C-alpha cells in the first residue's frame, strides 16, 4: 500500500502545482532537463558505486555475477518492449498515432521506484543482498531505456543528435561500470562525493512524478480516452509481459537472487520514464499517461497473483 500512496501523493502534488500555476507549462522543459540529465545520472552512478564497489559483498562486486544481473535486466526490458511492439502492430498503430509511446509505456515496467519497497518488505534480513542485486540488475534496464528506448521514442536514430547518448544516465552507467570493474571505484567513491551524488540523485524520482502530475492536470480537460489501446496496454503490461518474464526466470541459468528480482519485476506496472520521454521526444504522452494510470491501479489486483505464481513455479519469495 505504501508504494501506491507515495506515488499518488507526488502525482497529486504535481497536479495541484500546475493547477495553481506554480509550475507553468514552459517550466517543464528545464525541470525535465534537471531530472533526466543531472539528478537521474547521479542516482544511477551512486547505486553502482554503493552496491558494486562499497558494499563489501564479493558476489555483487564480481564481474561474472554483475554481468549476469545486468544481462537479465536488459533481456527483461527487451522482451517487454518486443511484446508491446507486436501488440501495437496488431492494433495497426503507426508512428504518429501512438506506436512508439505504446511500445515503450506498455513494454517498460517501473523497475526501480516500485520494486524497492516490495523487496524491503519481503526480504528483511540485515545481510540479505536482494536489494543490491536489484540495483545491479537495473543497470541493464538503464542501458536499454537510454539507448534502444530513446531511439524508439524518437522514431529512429536518424531523428536524434548522437550527443544524447553521451550524457545523462547512459554516461553514468558506462563510467560507473568502468570504475567498478577496473578497481578504480574505491578511489572515486569517497564519502563527500558519494553523499553529494546521493542527495542529488534522490531528487530524480520526485521530480519525474511531479512532472507527471503536471501532465495529468494538462490532459484532464481535453484528454481523449482510448479504450482499445488502454485495454491492450493492460493486457500487455500485466498479462503477456509477466508471463514471458516468469518463463525467462524459470529457464535462464542465473543465480536464484537474480531470479527473485525477475519475478518481482514481472508483476510491476508501467514506468513513468517512457511518458516523460514521450513528452521530450515528440511522442504521444496522452496515451502513455492513460496506460501508466490504468496499469498502476489494476496492479493492485494482479501484483500479488504474479508474485505468488513466480514464488511457486520459479524460486520461493516468502
Pin down the residues of each PLM region.
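Alpha-helical transmembrane segments of multi-pass small-molecule/ion transporters
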Residues: 1-318
Amino acid at each position: 500500500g505504501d508504494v501506491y500512496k507515495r506515488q499518488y501523493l507526488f502525482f497529486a502534488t504535481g497536479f495541484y502545482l500546475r493547477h495553481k500555476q506554480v509550475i507553468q507549462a514552459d517550466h517543464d522543459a528545464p525541470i525535465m532537463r534537471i531530472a533526466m540529465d543531472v539528478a537521474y545520472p547521479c542516482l544511477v552512478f551512486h547505486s553502482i558505486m554503493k552496491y558494486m564497489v562499497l558494499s563489501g559483498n564479493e558476489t555483487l562486486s564480481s564481474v561474472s555475477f554483475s554481468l549476469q544481473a545486468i544481462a537479465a535486466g536488459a533481456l527483461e526490458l527487451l522482451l517487454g518492449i518486443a511484446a508491446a511492439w507486436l501488440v501495437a502492430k496488431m492494433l495497426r498503430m503507426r508512428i504518429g498515432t501512438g506506436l512508439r509511446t505504446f511500445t515503450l509505456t506498455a513494454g517498460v515496467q517501473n523497475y526501480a521506484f516500485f520494486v524497492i519497497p516490495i523487496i524491503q518488505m519481503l526480504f528483511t534480513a540485515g545481510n540479505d543482498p536482494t536489494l543490491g542485486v536489484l540495483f545491479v540488475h537495473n543497470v541493464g534496464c538503464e542501458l536499454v531505456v537510454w539507448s534502444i528506448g530513446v531511439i524508439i521514442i524518437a522514431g529512429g536514430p536518424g531523428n536524434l543528435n548522437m550527443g544524447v547518448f553521451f550524457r545523462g544516465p547512459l554516461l553514468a552507467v558506462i563510467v560507473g561500470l568502468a570504475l567498478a570493474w577496473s578497481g578504480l571505484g574505491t578511489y572515486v567513491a569517497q564519502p563527500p562525493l558519494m553523499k553529494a551524488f546521493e542527495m542529488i540523485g534522490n531528487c530524480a524520482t520526485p521530480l519525474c512524478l511531479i512532472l507527471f502530475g503536471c501532465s495529468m492536470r494538462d490532459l484532464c480537460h481535453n484528454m481523449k480516452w482510448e479504450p482499445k489501446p488502454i485495454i491492450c496496454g493492460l493486457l500487455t503490461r500485466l498479462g503477456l509481459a509477466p508471463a514471458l518474464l516468469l518463463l525467462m526466470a524459470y529457464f535462464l541459468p542465473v543465480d536464484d537472487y537474480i531470479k527473485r528480482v525477475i519475478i518481482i519485476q514481472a508483476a510491476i506496472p508501467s514506468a513513468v520514464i517512457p511518458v516523460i520521454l514521450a513528452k521530450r521526444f515528440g511522442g504521444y504522452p496522452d496515451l502513455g499517461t492513460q496506460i501508466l494510470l490504468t496499469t498502476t491501479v489494476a496492479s493492485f489486483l494482479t501484483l500479488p497473483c504474479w508474485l505468488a505464481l513466480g514464488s511457486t513455479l520459479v524460486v520461493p519469495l516468502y
